[in-house]
């Protein structure tokens, strides 16, 4: 395993608009890329406002009140997902983002359709410790370790900065070239480079890229990100959007509906018979699902009502 050539190069940086066609080839070569201005600042600001009340009241991921506690994340981490339920910015601006969908199409073309495996806003409190170096999907989808080492990735993760990412407040560590390693037994923190970013920038990695969240050294700064994991439709998502009210689902574009699992999916194989079908018919046709409909008054927050956030 050769690592010397990858130790201290900087993460490549590309424009979300001007360099869109170069993004996925760059990830294939280096294992990571920083996409500048993936989300406009105005979208970041709206997304932050919409998630603020929910992040503040969400129990820690490892809370024993949860049916499926997440003991991988630190106790100084707050995480809220199923964002389509209450965030208009997520529903309209993130899910329909042209660069996001171009990159996902490029990454998964050999497999077929893709969707969101999880979209979660994570807030890391001051003094949040560094994570261990790891590869994504290993705490939920062990099948990825049984794939051929040179198989195309089945998922990618975009860590989108919603607040500044600095070395001091814990910007993500990445080992360039590690997506080509057979394992991560030789990985060390000394081999990492940092994903320093402004709000709206994103670091894109594959499910084989070795990385970790950094430690906050400021003692005062809270760091927030949108962790957006995209994957092939042949893999079960980590989150379910079945509780999102139908009027909200019908306000989405057909693309966004597919990304949150409310439309049938297709693979790339010849004579594809479809995925998530109902006796050979699609979900959307069976349900008579509409799209891009105006939302009724009072439906912006879906199942997350005012009482759920203490009347805020």
Swiss-Prot record:
What this protein is called in its record is Iron/alpha-ketoglutarate-dependent dioxygenase penM
Q: Which reaction does it catalyse?
A: (-)-cyclopeptine + 2-oxoglutarate + O2 = (Z)-dehydrocyclopeptine + succinate + CO2 + H2O; (Z)-dehydrocyclopeptine + 2-oxoglutarate + O2 = (-)-cyclopenine + succinate + CO2; (-)-4'-methoxycyclopeptine + 2-oxoglutarate + O2 = (Z)-4'-methoxydehydrocyclopeptine + succinate + CO2 + H2O; (Z)-4'-methoxydehydrocyclopeptine + 2-oxoglutarate + O2 = (-)-4'-methoxycyclopenine + succinate + CO2
- One Gene Ontology term from the biological process aspect of the record: biosynthetic process
Q: Does the keyword Methyltransferase apply?
A: no
Tell me the subunit arrangement: Homodimer.
EC code: 1.14.11.-
Q: Which family does it belong to?
A: Belongs to the PhyH family.
User: Which organism is this protein's natural source?
Assistant: Penicillium thymicola
What is an example of a GO molecular function annotated in this UniProt entry?
A: dioxygenase activity
Report the function annotation for this chain: Iron/alpha-ketoglutarate-dependent dioxygenase; part of the gene cluster that mediates the biosynthesis of penigequinolones, potent insecticidal alkaloids that contain a highly modified 10-carbon prenyl group. The first stage is catalyzed by the nonribosomal peptide synthetase penN that condenses anthranilic acid and O-methyl-L-tyrosine to produce 4'-methoxycyclopeptin.
| Needed cofactors | Fe cation
Do you know which InterPro entries this protein is assigned to?
Phytyl_CoA_dOase-like (IPR008775)
């Amino acid at each position: 395993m050769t690592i010397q050539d990858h130790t201290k190069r900087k993460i490549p940086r590309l424009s979300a608009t001007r360099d869109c066609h170069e993004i996925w080839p760059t990830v294939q070569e280096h294992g990571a890329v920083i996409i500048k201005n993936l989300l406009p600042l105005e979208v970041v600001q709206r997304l932050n406002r919409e998630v603020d009340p929910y992040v503040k009241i969400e129990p820690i991921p490892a809370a024993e009140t949860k049916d499926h506690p997440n003991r991988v994340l630190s106790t100084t981490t707050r995480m809220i997902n199923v964002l389509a339920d209450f965030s208009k910015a997520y529903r309209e601006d993130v899910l329909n983002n042209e660069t996001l969908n171009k990159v996902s199409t490029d990454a998964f073309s050999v497999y077929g359709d893709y969707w969101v495996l999880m979209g979660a806003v994570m807030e890391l409190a001051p003094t949040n410790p560094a994570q261990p170096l790891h590869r994504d999907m290993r705490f939920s989808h062990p099948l990825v370790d049984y794939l051929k080492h040179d198989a195309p990735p089945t998922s990618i993760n975009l860590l989108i900065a919603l607040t500044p990412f600095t070395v001091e407040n814990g910007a993500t560590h990445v080992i360039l070239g590690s997506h080509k390693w057979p394992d991560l037994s030789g990985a060390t923190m000394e081999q990492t480079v940092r994903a320093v970013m402004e709000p709206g920038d994103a670091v894109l990695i594959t499910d084989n890229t070795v990385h970790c969240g950094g430690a906050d050294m400021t003692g005062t700064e809270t760091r927030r990100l949108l962790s957006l994991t995209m994957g092939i439709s042949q893999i079960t998502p980590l989150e379910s959007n079945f509780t999102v009210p139908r009027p909200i689902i019908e306000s989405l574009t057909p693309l966004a509906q597919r990304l949150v699992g409310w439309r049938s999916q297709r693979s790339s194989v010849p004579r594809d018979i479809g995925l998530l079908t109902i006796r050979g018919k699609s979900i959307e046709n069976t349900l008579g699902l509409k799209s891009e409909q105006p939302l009724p008054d009072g439906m912006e927050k879906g199942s997350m009502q005012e009482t759920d956030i203490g009347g805020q």
